Amino acid sequence: MGASGLVWTLTIVLIAGLMLVDYVLHVRKTHVPTLRQAVIQSATFVGIAILFGIAVVVFGGSELAVEYFACYLTDEALSVDNLFVFLVIISSFGVPRLAQQKVLLFGIAFALVTRTGFIFVGAALIENFNSAFYLFGLVLLVMAGNLARPTGLESRDAETLKRSVIIRLADRFLRTSQDYNGDRLFTVSNNKRMMTPLLLVMIAVGGTDILFAFDSIPALFGLTQNVYLVFAATAFSLLGLRQLYFLIDSLLDRLVYLSYGLAVILGFIGVKLMLEALHDNKIPFINGGKPVPTVEVSTTQSLTVIIIVLLITTAASFWSARGRAQNAMARARRYATAYLDLHYETESAERDKIFTALLAAERQINTLPTKYRMQPGQDDDLMTLLCRAHAARDAHM
């Protein structure tokens, strides 16, 4: 399916149109989407991605459709992993809930532009350098190793992100205010026009998007060398990311084994790329520059492995004791924060509802085994937050 210029143009117009409609209908007017809205919008974008896959079957055949769906599933799984980092960034900078949609839409648009650039660079490398698959495979194996290490997960903490080079440079050279002004990027403070912290958040999100492209793009080229399919799969997986954030932000902490599943997927694709590179080897110091007989892994087999790994990872996360512990702590943290954020004029019924939910989460934590309750680096902060919420409750009574 060597897509023609017309097909490329129509696809780009479709994607741009979907982003514009999403902005006009759901982002331009500042609001927090309800669960029902998030479900409907997420289902809509997934449905569009599936319809595109059906179109690939009709016009390109089943083999190309399998390649597309394998790329789409892989990039969607990696995008869910991106949401962990987005959540950390948004939480660490204290972005108001009403402004989060604009941050996410910017991140998606920026990611689409940068990843498109990476896609064409990757395609050029594959076309002109015989050893490109060795490079891509090595990158994926390194990324898989980083995801599999517990320390790789710890690098996502808020302070690490805030200390990143991009944020430190922006904070130093850009005049920013200390407070947010709704979802505006600029405000006036002391008769001076300044940028709000929302711009720093967007810079942080954009910077992390660039880093994530280093594992997602090689992974997709490990499944297909069709540039058009790689672009389409990337675009459709990113388009639904904003809705997915609001749909599963309460479940992200529960997916405790997702990174390990992604490590397996990236490692598998990395090995697949290495095998393909050996099969077409032309490097003089490897087997005298001659191809090496290897096992061929089909795209259908790759798609099967991806689906099985994601199913096992998700099931293990939701049914494990560690997953239940993470969920209980996340709920307690969320309700404690929600209670502390209540306005002093909030109705008593609403206060009681949130505090009752907080007490239920605390009771669930108390029923957990000690080894799951005592998590280094999280326990002290959570206990402090809970104490503040109880103190606020006592002060209001």
Swiss-Prot record:
Q: According to its record, how does it sit in the membrane?
A: Multi-pass membrane protein
Any stretches that span the bilayer, and where are they?
1-21, 39-59, 76-96, 103-123, 124-144, 194-214, 219-239, 255-275, 301-321
Q: Which organism is it from?
A: Mycobacterium tuberculosis (strain CDC 1551 / Oshkosh)
| Similarity section | Belongs to the TerC family.
Q: What is this protein called?
A: Uncharacterized membrane protein MT2795
Could you list this entry's UniProt keywords, alphabetically sorted: Cell membrane, Membrane, Transmembrane, Transmembrane helix
List the Pfam families: TerC
Where it sits in the cell: the answer is: Cell membrane
- The organism's place on the tree of life at top rank: Bacteria
Which cellular component, as a GO term, is one annotated location?
plasma membrane
